[in-house]
Amino acid sequence: MIKIYDTMTRSLRDFVPLTENVVNMYVCGPTVYNYIHIGNARSAVAFDTIRRYFEYCGYTVNYISNFTDVDDKIIKAANEAGISTKELSDKFIAAFMEDTGQLGIKPATQNPRVINYMDEIIAFVSTLVDKGFAYVSEGDVYFRVAKSNNYAKLANKTLEDLEIGASGRTDAETERKENPLDFALWKAAKEGEVSWNSPWGPGRPGWHIECSVMATEILGDTIDIHGGGADLEFPHHTNEIAQSETKTGKTFANYWMHNGFVNVDNEKMSKSLGNFVTVHDMLQTVDGQVLRFFLATQQYRKPINFTEKAIHDAEVNLKYLKNTHSLPLTEQVNQAELQTYLDTFQEAMDDDFNTANGVTVLFDMAKWINSGNYDQTVKDAFEKMLQVFGIVFEEEVLDEDIEKLIEERQAARANKDFATADRIRDELAAQGIKLLDTKEGVRWTRD
């Protein structure tokens, strides 16, 4: 049985879906005002790998990941560029799809956009106001955190702890609030900003309400898994829980999952340190499958360190797996040995999607394959395991001239004409084709 580390309970829990053999997942997507950075990619790859393992186990996965296309950062960037917020969002949504495509990330079941859910957002906020859990102040609408049951339980904080931390705030927005911790559900329009009409005047939604509405509209009041980066645990996911459970009276998500941060050369990635890396730029020099392999093979909850050496190692390891995959098939192998690898792989991945252990099994299996155990059953199993990590190798076909040279070399060896055989081997090596003579015949790999 799959076990998931649930942030809410700080414990490993058996995964039991609401509907048998179906997984409903909502993962917070990017705010589309710029190209995604390596931290965004880490989250996208981590949850794509989790999705793929569920599918490997036979589940049907409804995978929802949103685009935040109404936000302060988008408004600022659009104004600076002299274009509309929609034009800016469209540009970076297209860039996101291109970049994640190169990372082998499967398209989501749906990618909802905030601009398409404005009526539903207004209705959601209205319900909270009517219930007395939200209030209007100068055109803004705020959520009353003091009325929320066990607010900040996800972050393992008490309301009293948070109030002490917020006690010194004196900005203009705080003056409009009943409590400094109250958060905006709806923001009154400002000059030069995109806005929509509402019962409280023209404005736009706050960030937290957007995800609550899109998740519940598509997947229902209670979902199986809600995920995102560790930085979203508080306040974003905390506020999603407060407003969603207040409105519906139901548990918002049964499992909360958060991926770890990405460091660059052992330092936290930030623009101020000058180590902020976009995926768009990185893909100019690093193959998308290599970057994917680096990100996917680290245990998703742990921080990872991005270095040139780590990328180089990922490239070398991926090449080994590719060469293994391209080996010619052998006679039928011991199926009990194959089953041992499959069982060990499942045991690793069932343990909170431990890809670090899972990839170790993959390399152990590759070593076994290279020792002459590679019939069609093994190849099919190997490919399915690779696909969990988002790795798909195309079948490589040698051109006729190279195939002819390999045949000529085999004939020369059969006739004990080793000088000709060695010459052909060197000629093929110059073209990047490495030959391996085994008891099953000649195998080749491409450097």
Map each language-model feature to its residues.
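Short phosphate-binding/catalytic loops that engage adenosine nucleotides
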Residues: 59, 133, 433
